Amino acid sequence: MQVYPKFMRSAMATEHFPPVTAPEFAFLGRSNVGKSSLINALLGSKQAKVSSTPGRTRAINFFSLTTSPERQQPNFLFADLPGYGYAKISKSISAEWPKFIEPYLAERPSLALCLCLVDSNIPPQPSDAQLTEFLRSIGRPYLVVATKADRLSGNGRTKAKQTLSRALEAENLLLCSAKTGLGMKELWGEIHRVAAEATEAMKQNQRPPSA
């Protein structure tokens, strides 16, 4: 399905979040996990800035997506959250976490799914396990997306999937590559499925109670 992305805004405070209008998908992951590259591959454009400097993103960047160029209201939103786990920026991210990152993850009513990006080429990291544990504690559904899978052989992908799924308690894990397109169709399928369910749930909540 063709989508039409548009950058909305950057937010470093809860009052700067966009209005709740459509289901949202949060992209989270360690710095240099390939988060911006994956978002750009999904969008088919260079909307998210790719940097060789880890931790460049310090705000939540929101993108609106529509399935028609004429549509004004977004069908759903992508939220690109700051990377974590890099020594030089760990203190700054830790300081920002309670200000607007944790409130977004814990309280945002339109957040439909958290996409937790991990590097398929390295062992599971403690910070990744801490993130998924936090999401489970607040009842947020999440999908683990293992990036850079094009660098692994067939057996390597199988082993990585098993290891990461077990370490992160992931019932569903997708191996993806922004470079080759591996797993992107499946990832889009999951996003569209969740978006459709969340859109219907939001409509139900907006309907007045019957007499």
Swiss-Prot record:
GO biological process, one term: division septum assembly
Residues annotated as binding GTP: 29-36, 55-59, 80-83, 147-150, 176-178
UniProt cross-references to InterPro entries, sorted A to Z: G_ENGB_dom, GTP-bd, GTP-bd_ribosome_bio_YsxC, P-loop_NTPase
Keyword vocabulary terms for this entry: Cell cycle, Cell division, GTP-binding, Magnesium, Metal-binding, Nucleotide-binding, Septation
Cross-referenced NCBIfam families: GTPase_YsxC (TIGR03598)
Protein role: Necessary for normal cell division and for the maintenance of normal septation.
Protein name listed in UniProt: Probable GTP-binding protein EngB
Organism of this sequence: Acidobacterium capsulatum (strain ATCC 51196 / DSM 11244 / BCRC 80197 / JCM 7670 / NBRC 15755 / NCIMB 13165 / 161)
